Swiss-Prot record:
GO terms for cellular component: cytoplasm; small ribosomal subunit. HAMAP family: Ribosomal_bS16 (MF_00385). Keywords: Ribonucleoprotein, Ribosomal protein. It comes from the Bacteria. The keyword Ribonucleoprotein applies. One of its GO terms (biological process) is translation. Belongs to the bacterial ribosomal protein bS16 family. GO terms for molecular function: structural constituent of ribosome. This is Small ribosomal subunit protein bS16. Coiled coil: none annotated. It comes from Ehrlichia chaffeensis (strain ATCC CRL-10679 / Arkansas).
Length: 87
């Protein structure tokens, strides 16, 4: 079983809202997930405190046990939007 940390889409039409979830890679994008780690709201400016909110300790745990982050989650970490060094 390959586990991925990815975004699951929620919200209304033209008003997307995403949850950061840990899910089996074979499950549909918005399907069943193992754990919800936080959320991402692209409708807010990047400076807003609720643009991205993630449980960093759980994110670090899942990365340590071999879960793979998708491109978008990796980009958030690389750009410092999700700061995994603080926890």
């Amino acid at each position: 079983m390959s586990v991925k940390i990815r975004l699951a889409r929620f919200g209304a039409k033209k008003r997307p809202f995403y949850r950061v979830v840990v899910a089996d890679s074979r499950v549909a994008r918005d399907g069943k997930f193992i754990e919800s780690l936080g959320f991402y709201n692209p409708m807010l400016p990047k400076e807003h405190e609720l643009f991205v909110k993630v449980k960093v300790d759980r994110l670090k745990y899942w990365l340590s046990v071999g879960a793979q982050a998708t491109d978008r989650i990796s980009w958030f970490i690389k750009k410092g939007i999700i700061n995994i060094e603080t926890a």
